[in-house]
């Protein structure tokens, strides 16, 4: 049961967001979704802010095979987005290229940095859906057409429109947001 009045609703351990999605949006309060799992927080971020790119990355002809599951699981387990050298690459491009060429290279570098998050989100979504019990460790051996989720993803994007997505340890999150008028769930 929710309190009668609060200024901010904060899901400390957001997980699948069942409570957030189960409650009606409230214009009177700020909503914060948090999960320590960076893949899950990234998935929610991409569903909220990059919906079209996320759906495009999911693809329209999914394979849903054990081989695809293994490739996706390996991608999620081993590959993190690497933007460590983005600033350095942009500085070098600006220094050595003429302005029109620099702008084109800058656009490509920034798009590639952003797309990594979308690719990771799409891979994680498929890993969840294709795995046994959504555990992300073993193939579920059941047919699943990712296209059946497209409408739900659009609905989730609209529901998350005014929600802050965080990826913090619960203690850091509570320290940051703790106020008398907040409701932590």
Regions found by a protein language model. Name each.
Residues 26-167, 171:
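Class I S-adenosyl-L-methionine-dependent methyltransferase module
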Residues 1-4, 176-177:
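Glycine-rich helix-loop-beta junction characteristic of Rossmann-like nucleotide cofactor-binding loops
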Residues 6, 30, 182-184:
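The start of beta-strands in P-loop NTPase/AAA+ ATPase cores
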Residues 6-13, 32:
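Conserved class I S-adenosyl-L-methionine
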Residues 164-185:
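Active-site segment flanking the S-adenosylmethionine/decSAM binding pocket
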Residues 17-20, 41, 173-175:
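Short, well-ordered alpha-helical microsegments
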Residues 16-28:
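Conserved SAM-binding loop of SAM-dependent methyltransferases across substrates and taxa
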Residues 12-14, 147-148:
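Short, motif-level signal for alpha-helix interfacial/capping segments enriched in acidic residues
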């Amino acid at each position: 049961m929710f309190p009668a009045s609060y200024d901010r609703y904060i899901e400390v351990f957001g997980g699948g967001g069942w409570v957030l999605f189960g409650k009606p949006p409230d214009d009177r309060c700020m909503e914060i979704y948090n999960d320590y799992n960076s893949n899950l927080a990234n998935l929610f971020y991409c569903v909220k802010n990059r919906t079209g790119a996320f759906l495009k990355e999911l693809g329209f002809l999914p394979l849903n095979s054990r081989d695809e599951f293994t490739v996706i699981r390996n991608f999620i387990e081993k590959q993190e987005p690497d933007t460590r050298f983005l600033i350095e690459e942009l500085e070098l491009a600006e220094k050595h290229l003429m302005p029109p060429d620099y702008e084109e290279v800058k656009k490509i570098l920034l798009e590639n940095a952003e797309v990594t998050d979308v690719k990771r989100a799409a891979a994680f979504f498929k890993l969840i859906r294709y795995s046994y019990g959504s555990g992300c460790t073993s193939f579920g051996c059941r047919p699943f057409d990712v296209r059946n989720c497209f409408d739900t993803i659009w609905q989730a994007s609209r529901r998350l429109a005014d929600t802050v997505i965080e990826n913090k340890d619960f203690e850091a999150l509570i320290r940051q947001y703790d106020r008398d008028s907040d409701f932590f769930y």
